[in-house]
Each structure stands twice: as C-alpha cells, then as structure tokens.
Amino acid sequence: MKNTVKQLRKQAGMRQEDMARLLGVSRQTIIAIENDKYNPTLELAMKIAKLLGLHVDEIFFLDEE
C-alpha cells in the first residue's frame, strides 16, 4: 500500500518524533510507514488520519501494480 504520510506530516510541520509520540508508536514505525515498508493496522491508519485531519483514503492508496 502506498501512502502520503511523509508529505502530509511535513506540511503539518511535524517531526517523525512528534507524530510517533502523538500516536503512541515508535519513530521507527513512522519511518517504516513512510518508506512503504510497513502497512499500519486499521486502528493506526485511522489515528494517523485523525491526527492529520483527513480521511484514511486520502492518505493510503492500494498499489495496483
């Protein structure tokens, strides 16, 4: 699954550490999500969307390759 977490996080003026703390996850988890190495759980995806003020489908996209 592809995502725009990194771009949206930067637009919001947040560091990876800030986002991780607010979501209750490690910085490594944020890095993995941003680099498409880890697909978050539905709960975490919803928390990310809420934090960024967006819908989940505005952040995460199916990779149709």
Task: List each language-model region with its residue ranges.
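Short, charged recognition helix plus adjacent turn
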Residues: 61-65
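Residue cluster at the C-terminal edge of the helix-turn-helix DNA-binding motif
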Residues: 22, 51-52
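Recognition helix of helix-turn-helix/homeodomain-like DNA-binding domains
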Residues: 25-38
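Hydrophobic micro-packing sites on short alpha-helices
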Residues: 45-49, 59
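Short basic helix-loop element that most often maps to the first helix and adjoining turn
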Residues: 4-22
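Key DNA-contact positions within bacterial/archaeal DNA-binding proteins
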Residues: 17, 28, 57
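Short, Lys/Arg-enriched C-terminal cap helix and immediately downstream tail that follows
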Residues: 8, 42-43
